[in-house]
Amino acid sequence: MAEPYNHRAIEQKWRDKWESTPINVNDGKKPKYYCLDMFPYPSGSGLHVGHWRGYVISDVWSRYKMLQGYYLIHPMGWDAFGLPAENYAIKMGTHPKITTASNIKNIKRQINEIAAIYDWDMEVNTTDPNFYKWTQWIFVKMFKAGLAYEKEMPINWCPSCKTGLANEEVVDGCCERCGSPVTKKNLKQWMLRITKYADRLLNDLDKLDWPEKVKKMQTDWIGKSYGAEVDFPVEGKDEKITVYTTRPDTLHGATFMVLAPEHAMAKELATDETREAVEKYIFNASMKSNVDRLQDKEKTGVFTGSYAINPLNGAKVPIWLSDYVLADYGTGAIMCVPAHDDRDFEFATKFNIPIIQVIAKDGKEIENMTEAYTEAAGTMINSGEWNGMESSVLKKEAPLMIEKMGIGRKTVNYKLRDWVFSRQRYWGEPIPIVHCPKCGAVPVPEEELPLLLPEVEKYQPTGTGESPLADITEWVNTTCPCCGAPAKRETNTMPQWAGSSWYFLRYVDNKNDKELVNREKADKYLPVDMYIGGVEHAVLHLLYSRFYTKFLNDIGVIDFDEPFKKLFNQGMITGKNGIKMSKSKGNVVSPDDLVRDYGCDSLRIYELFVGPPELDSEWDDKGIEGVNRFLKRFWKLALDNKDNDVKATPELIKVRHKLVHDITNRLNSFSLNTVISGFMEYNNKLMELSKKGGVDKETLETYIILLAPFAPHVSEELWEQFGHTDSVFHATWPEYDEEAMKDDEIEIPVQINGKTKCTIAINPDGDKDEILAKAKEALGDKVNGTIRKEIYVPGRIVNLVVK
């Protein structure tokens, strides 16, 4: 009789053993496999069952790779600088240095409850000066390469977080962190020239084994388009306004022009009659968030009083301002062709601007247009020398024609904008720049890095556009590294993405104080083979990491240019009715009580069983009870048969190979919920076979090895009980034999005139005549008439044609 399954005693025993005798040891002979989780923000609320999901998935995959003979690189660290940590500290009224350390301690305890096989010797923390020395070093290298520069510009401003935001941190016009509507603020900012890498970031997506959804999100964010820039002279001025258009074929239909209110020429285009209205409109637009400006509601605008000249036909084009045009896309100015664009049509109709149709179906002009004609194809009309051409042909040829005329040029445009890298906050890496009145912006010498973040009592954001560091005069005032003259330090800090854009490189050489990563170690252990985390990072972190990796490859630090070979995005675990778990909603399920009551192994398995891992799944506490019962049943099955000297029957051999086949293939396709259902299904089969005469040792040990990545504690205990002195994770992942899986007999239907009358059991490789004879015997007196034709589809069906 098997002793009861005591999860508390068993799990504590094996955690102690793993700590004293690590199971993942680099012997220098095994190939490496680098499996990485997106490292967490050390938030104050700790981990809930939703966080566990990604960590369990990565741990299962990691242990699977160990059993396949790899040396596993599976580290963990802390994304501890930036807004999440600082906002929590402000909320608690405690210095972020203290709250961050406390939160890390708590989350590390919770992560250890998962029994994940993390190598804590590789741990990194983005707030550690030994780490952010290299974050600053990368910035200095980018500065020297011309990729980091200063620019005064209207930036996204979060009035709640009181800091600037990159475009990628604005979701539907709101701050990605706190959800507040984002406004615009003119500030001098540090920028990173990510746009220089736009084509490589786009083209190299083809190299990656990533979800197509993520690749599309990055493709759309980079937003490459082909078109033309067209120069419109301003009437009465020796100036031109350049517009970008993807439809230069419609240039004859441009009846007005719209500039973003932030456009450099917006104010100077105002006449005496319009100046007051123009300045009021510009001010009102500055108070709106981008989401308000782009929402599909009634368009607003103001006429500047000035005109541009259509360079193709000499027509006067009124110049308007409207907040539906954004300064940071294209040139911040658009030519408007209301006959062929819904938004332009709405604007022209509201403000009584002429509408000229230049593309028509079959060349026939629409009288009294009530909506824009937006069909892609048509014949050119009202277009001078272009009349009669097919618009699809002209669209391709027009950029070169415009270029030859000297009124514009063929252009490729990107939605991607340079990365706003400054943050007006305290809790971040100091930007290693000194501002000298003589020399300008000068980088801190590399040998003086890290530039330490000074200790302060007042760390709250100022909201003035200045970082709290600006008040520390003894830190700000310094000397120029170039000329020795009095100078001032840069007081903005880096964004939270600075450290997370390269941290995965540092794990494999985290104690190196001479270089970011030793080249020999980088060549041996990098890049990441499998990266696991939420899809919410598709554009932000994943795009920035690719940019940093390409830059570090360019300067010779590493010899690869993509950080993560394969990516898996797990879905969210939600509370009831699909609502996201959060403390404020009161629907957070803590793993601590579940581990105490059911054990870590039960919780790990339920995290996977709850639904397809790539989809959101609703949590139900009752589900873990069923998983716990399954583990107890297998525990009893294994121990009840442990000492039985049972010889493997053909049926047991077949079941064993099918078990290995099904579990392996489901695991390889990341169908982890069906892996768990497979374990349950085969456990039931083995329990039935056990009643008939027992289960052989090899079949049970095979099951234990397969189960080990999912339920490591119970698997280790059973492996030991079966007489093994080494860890189950030093075993080898079982293989299956297709021949051994074949059924000796299968059931096939027997039909008369296409209608099934009975079934027969046959050998799939049996003789056709014997099978037909067996079929006729089984039918007996059901055959009424003369058999005209006998059909046998091997292994599938018998059909008799009877008349």
Language-model regions: role of each:
Residues 1-36, 66-75, 99-106, 210, ...:
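Conserved oxyanion/phosphate-binding beta-strand-loop segments in alpha/beta enzyme cores
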Residues 1-21, 25-32, 260-263, 272-275, ...:
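Basic, alpha-helical terminal appendages of large translation-related enzymes
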Residues 4, 13, 17-21, 91-241, ...:
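Residue patterns forming the tRNA-binding/recognition surfaces of aminoacyl-tRNA synthetases
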Residues 27-94, 100, 123-138, 161, ...:
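N-terminal catalytic cores of NTP/NDP-binding nucleotidyl/phosphoryl-transfer enzymes
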Residues 58, 71, 263-362, 367, ...:
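Catalytic alpha/beta core of large soluble enzyme barrels
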Residues 79, 144-158, 410-441, 496, ...:
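Helix-rich, typically C-terminal accessory recognition domains appended to large enzymatic cores
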Residues 195, 200-224, 260-302, 447-479, ...:
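Amphipathic alpha-helical
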Residues 306-312, 316-329, 358, 478-613:
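Alpha-helical recognition segments enriched in aromatics with Gly/Pro capping
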